[in-house]
UniProtKB/Swiss-Prot annotation:
This is Phenylalanine--tRNA ligase alpha subunit. Binds 2 magnesium ions per tetramer. Its EC number is 6.1.1.20. It comes from Rhodopseudomonas palustris (strain BisB18). GO terms for molecular function: ATP binding; magnesium ion binding; phenylalanine-tRNA ligase activity; tRNA binding.
Amino acid sequence: MSDLAALQHTILADIAAASDEAALEAVRVAALGKKGAISALLATLGKMSPEERKTEGAAINLAKMVVTDALAARRELLKNAALDKRLASETIDVTLPLRENPAEQGRIHPLSQVMDELTTIFADMGFAIAEGPDIETDDYNFTKLNFPEGHPAREMHDTFYFNPKQDGSRLLLRTHTSPVQVRTMLSQKPPIRVICPGRTYRSDSDQTHTPMFHQVEGLVIDKGSHLGHLKWILHEFCKAFFEVDNINMRFRPSFFPFTEPSLEVDIQCRRDKGEIRFGEGEDWLEILGCGMVHPNVLTACGIDPEVYQGFAWGMGIDRIAMLKYGMSDLRQLFEADVRWLNHYGFKPLDVPTLAGGLSS
């Protein structure tokens, strides 16, 4: 037993002295390998009497367990030390100046920039962000939004459908972010105040349309909500987003299945040598659609239209990004052209005028 204790002490000392994983592996082989010291002791158990085997076997197995645990602990320690050493050698001095060559500097994509601006503006008004899946059911995308059977938007030339299931139902790529509003109304009790930014899909592609595009929609459900509230929100948004103190807006009657009454919104602008200036001029430019939530939609989502009413609006993020920053072709937003991004993108450390104004 004294020899076993001395052997264990020696092996533990060798483990503690191992300076790297290779040295530690050598100690493991010398102790627990096929020809290792402890393995040799275990091989002698077969020649012992049952009484000796019971006593000696327990002692040898205990020594093996102690050595195994010590090896594991030392290996973990060495691994962490090696990682710390590597990380120390890879330290980046964040006080170093940026690369001077603009081509070597990354850019924030205009769509990411505009999404940040949108969420900042509406968050300042007390809106939360709601999200939902890109793949939707016909029920959430159309039926609960008061789209009757046979509505043109249900046709294959507008909507990307998946193959029918065995029961005949079909999933689809959402054609607007309105299904997120449906999910919100089904899962939350009023009052509700959310915006729903995200990707949407329609079978269309030209200079001003792409099969995948981005939308942001807003929804307010409460007692006593009315068009005056909607107009104020949209007016404040346009002033903040386009960074114009005085902006004139025009609300025109329109039709959307999910709102009644439905309106389209134009803002006053002046077109000058290919540029659009807002807040001046005699031209008008359509930017979004809106209206009071249709009672049928409220009922389909479990909200009593006799108690609550609400309003909603929606706009294309890609479109308003093009209007604000002077981009002429929607398709260029998705072409990953570094030259285009260097021209229209934003430097990561630049503080946008909008966010700067809100933070101060």
